[in-house]
């Protein structure tokens, strides 16, 4: 799989976190539940499902427990995370694929549901990613995803956090690609820590410490949070989107 140097840095950050991710992913689990809740209330086809950026399989297991399916694919481009996912779902019939969601993993018009929990912030070209996913969905297929929005990690210095989009800018991208928007919501989640160092360790423990456009060739610095903060909170401003492929 050919990836550029930036993708390699993202891979490296997540592969390093393969054995710590699950212990520090309480926020990610809750976000996944919140994304699934309205989706389960909709009457959608779930025969063939793809869980992109599946990580250690937390989201894949939640999807498998929520919907009847014929084929469920778990896709990630970090090999060590996929190994963890396979271990978590070894009793299931889930198929695992080592691939990047920014490539065309599946044939056109082949998927009923695409699910992605907290993965698309790592897309280098989100609009092109949406075009690719649109083509892989069947007519009236559904795309459901959560993604950090502007305001996430606001406690970090500007040079120590990645740029995030607004809810409205993502809505505009989806509509420009051709999706019909079913829901677009945003919620705030917070995680508290005893010290700034513990907060930074939590980010590194889930592999989210790779800066997409660093001023220096490194990830988070040891103290990106103001030193006068003794009781530290990290904010997750999350967008939840469900969209349908409409053929004109």
Swiss-Prot record:
GO biological process: biotin biosynthetic process; methylation
Alphabetical list of PANTHER family matching this protein: ARGININE-HYDROXYLASE NDUFAF5, MITOCHONDRIAL
Cross-referenced InterPro entries: BioC, Malonyl-ACP_OMT, Methyltransf_25, SAM-dependent_MTases_sf
Molecular function (Gene Ontology), one example: malonyl-CoA methyltransferase activity
Organism domain of life: Bacteria
Keyword tags: Biotin biosynthesis, Methyltransferase, S-adenosyl-L-methionine, Transferase
Any Pfam family: Methyltransf_25
Pathway annotation from the record: Cofactor biosynthesis; biotin biosynthesis
Organism of this sequence: Coxiella burnetii (strain RSA 493 / Nine Mile phase I)
Chain's role: Converts the free carboxyl group of a malonyl-thioester to its methyl ester by transfer of a methyl group from S-adenosyl-L-methionine (SAM). It allows to synthesize pimeloyl-ACP via the fatty acid synthetic pathway.
Name listed for the protein in its UniProt record: Malonyl-[acyl-carrier protein] O-methyltransferase 2
